[in-house]
Amino acid sequence: MAKVKTPRWGWALTGSGHFFKECLALVGELDEVDLFVTRAAAEVLRMYKQDLRLPKSTRIFRDTTASAAPVGAFYYGVYHTLVLGPATSNTVAKCVVGISDTLATNVFAQAGKCRVPSIVFACDTAPEMETEAPKGMVKVYPRRIDLENTARLKDVDDVIVVETLAQLGTALSRRKRELA
């Protein structure tokens, strides 16, 4: 496979409902994006009754192979940036310790191995939070280990961890300027 002329955004969705709809809206605003949908994200799409109405140039990869075959594209320069968000505490923990057993954690690992910068929108970032569940807003209380893993992820090379939707928007804008 030859190196591509115009690298794309990669965006991995996990099984979190935290700002899920807003993340999908941001995906729709990007040019040339590939969406990696984990099995858990597919469940959340159904629970939140979300359709993937995205630009025609968007390619969708689902978590259907044991080896997460789509990750091979990272080796050939297909992606300039990976966005992982919303990222569950489970996904963040796996990223911190190097476990890559889902489509999301596999693309994160391959992005790191190929020095593709990653932006991670972590869900569990404060001791007390409000988040949207399928039937409305709920309070959640992330565990200390979840908060510690989010902090540890900030020390991973080529990774920017954002904790709010506003920070995600800023990180995306900054990356667009870097690529221009």
Regions found by a protein language model. Name each.
Residues 1-180:
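A cross-family phosphate/adenosyl-ligand binding-site feature
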